[in-house]
Amino acid sequence: MGLRLYKPYTASTRNRSVSDFSEITEKKPEKTLTSWVFRSKGRNNRGIITSRHLGGGHKRLYRLIDFKRQKIGILGKVATIEYDPNRNARIVLLHYQDGAKGYILHPRGLKVGGTVVTSPEAPILIGNCLPLKAIPLGTEVHNVELYSGMGGQLSRAAGSSAQIVAKEGRFVTLRLPSGEVRLVSQNCWATIGQVGNVDANNIRIGKAGRMRWLGRRPKVRGVVMNPNDHPHGGGEGRSPIGRKCPVSLWGRLALGERTRKSKKYSNKLILKRRKASK
């Protein structure tokens, strides 16, 4: 799991890097675990853009990932490690002892031929899934449930993991990849280890066309628009934005304004806010 660099034959290869895909063992997905998903491309039912800068991109089949780890007490053997076009993390195809098959996120260090199990009494080994109350302090976990039985929602991106820092009463304290420290019910399940493909955030796109392959359209600066298109627009030549602070297309503060609801019930579960983005 590393990066492959290109010699600077062209301007795009000078600043381009890709994953070396050395951990991939199978090119074609398990057909029974794929489905077609309609991609809205940022449009609503009337065709109006509701999320900007989305559209196009290569065709994809969605892989049905088991975020709930529903096969409790049944041993699963790692058959393949596969590429998933819908996420930066790799996925693992498990063959269970009862004949079923399923995909999970690839934990770093798990290899073909290894075994994993979902159980409250499972050993603390990479890829095993347990309730948070059964996992020792200091352990790195991923695919953590926010609410018991709803499936993993936290720490699912490539290279991410959360750390168990305390246990008190009905709650377990987690330090999340963002730096946020929050309480989660001790009955929520989590998977041991860190998500694989840790170099994903070091990949350099290199050219605009590669972003289009990923389904991302160009982002135009507001300062080069007309005043009827953006609050920053207008002026003669290269003009400043003409405001005290940058704002969004709809006039809301663009830098630093908190967007989380102030009366959200789960605010009391957050002990430390996430680090401010740079």
Swiss-Prot record:
Which BP terms from GO are recorded?
A: mitochondrial translation
Annotated spans, Disordered: 222-241
Q: Which Pfam families match?
A: Ribosomal_L2, Ribosomal_L2_C
What SUPFAM superfamilies does this protein map onto? Nucleic acid-binding proteins, Translation proteins SH3-like domain
Q: Which GO terms describe its cellular component?
A: chloroplast; mitochondrial large ribosomal subunit
Q: Which UniProt keywords apply?
A: Chloroplast, Plastid, Ribonucleoprotein, Ribosomal protein
S-S bridge residues: none
The cross-references to InterPro entries, in alphabetical order and at most eight, read: NA-bd_OB-fold, Rib_uL2_dom2, Ribosomal_uL2, Ribosomal_uL2_bac/org-type, Ribosomal_uL2_C, Ribosomal_uL2_CS, Ribosomal_uL2_dom3, Ribosomal_uL2_RNA-bd_dom
Question: What does the UniProt entry say about where the protein is found?
Answer: Plastid, Chloroplast
GO molecular function terms noted in the UniProt entry: rRNA binding; structural constituent of ribosome; transferase activity
Known PANTHER family for this protein? LARGE RIBOSOMAL SUBUNIT PROTEIN UL2M, RIBOSOMAL PROTEIN L2
Family per similarity comment: Belongs to the universal ribosomal protein uL2 family.
The family database entries (HAMAP family) matched by this protein are listed as:
Ribosomal_uL2_B
Its quaternary organisation is: Part of the 50S ribosomal subunit.
Q: What is this protein called?
A: Large ribosomal subunit protein uL2c
Organism of provenance? Tupiella akineta (Green alga)
Organism lineage reads as: Eukaryota, Viridiplantae, Chlorophyta, Ulvophyceae, OUU clade
